[in-house]
């Protein structure tokens, strides 16, 4: 089994590596049915070392975490790599895929100029528009039990935000939790977003 994810943080959390790192895929958009990147160079034409080839050929399961962030062209690039060193006639070389994620979370990142080119081949930038994936008969399993939260009211609030239903009651509940001037202690493990970190700098400018 090999575990990969689209970003470094997601890969660390999943106990794996990034998709680009494992498959040595360039960051340029991938053109389906071609081994060429946008600049016309054969960026996808290279050889893996014996150790990597052995890993790919012995792989029975490929786990992709945070699948909502994976672009369709990236998934097709993975398909090409697996077909190259396994069964060229089967999607993803015949490797079983387990894709984990929430489509209501982060979307794939695609620049306007990249999408102008990719839109010729894909209906959407999301992974489910992958040509290789459309050749498979995959099944979807929805996980409904929440294990991270035990507070029913808080869970309901999170679900409302997730579904973009921020009514006055939700906003009031969130505002009651706001603590002006709050300074967390380092040992408590709070996570600060870049927006909060950069806000004082913008005010002083």
Would you name each region that the model predicts?
Residues 1-202:
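Conserved ATP-binding/catalytic motifs of P-loop helicase motor domains
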């Amino acid at each position: 089994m090999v575990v990969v994810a689209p970003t470094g943080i997601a890969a660390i959390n999943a106990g794996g590596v990034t998709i680009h790192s494992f498959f040595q895929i360039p960051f340029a958009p991938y053109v389906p049915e071609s081994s060429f990147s946008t600049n016309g160079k054969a960026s996808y034409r290279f050889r893996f070392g014996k150790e990597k080839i052995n890993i790919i050929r012995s792989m029975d399961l490929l786990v992709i975490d945070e699948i909502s962030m994976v672009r369709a062209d990236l998934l097709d690039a993975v398909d090409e790599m697996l077909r190259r060193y396994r069964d060229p006639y089967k999607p993803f070389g015949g490797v079983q895929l387990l894709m984990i994620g929430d489509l209501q979370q982060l979307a794939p990142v695609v620049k306007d100029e990249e999408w102008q080119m990719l839109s010729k081949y894909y209906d959407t930038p999301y992974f489910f528009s992958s040509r290789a994936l459309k050749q498979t008969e995959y099944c979807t399993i929805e996980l409904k039990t929440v294990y991270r939260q035990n507070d029913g009211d808080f869970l309901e609030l999170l679900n409302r935000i997730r579904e973009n239903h921020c009514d006055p009651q939700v906003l009031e509940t969130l505002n009651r939790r706001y603590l002006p001037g709050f300074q967390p202690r380092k040992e408590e493990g709070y996570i600060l977003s870049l927006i909060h970190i950069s806000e004082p700098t913008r005010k002083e400018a």
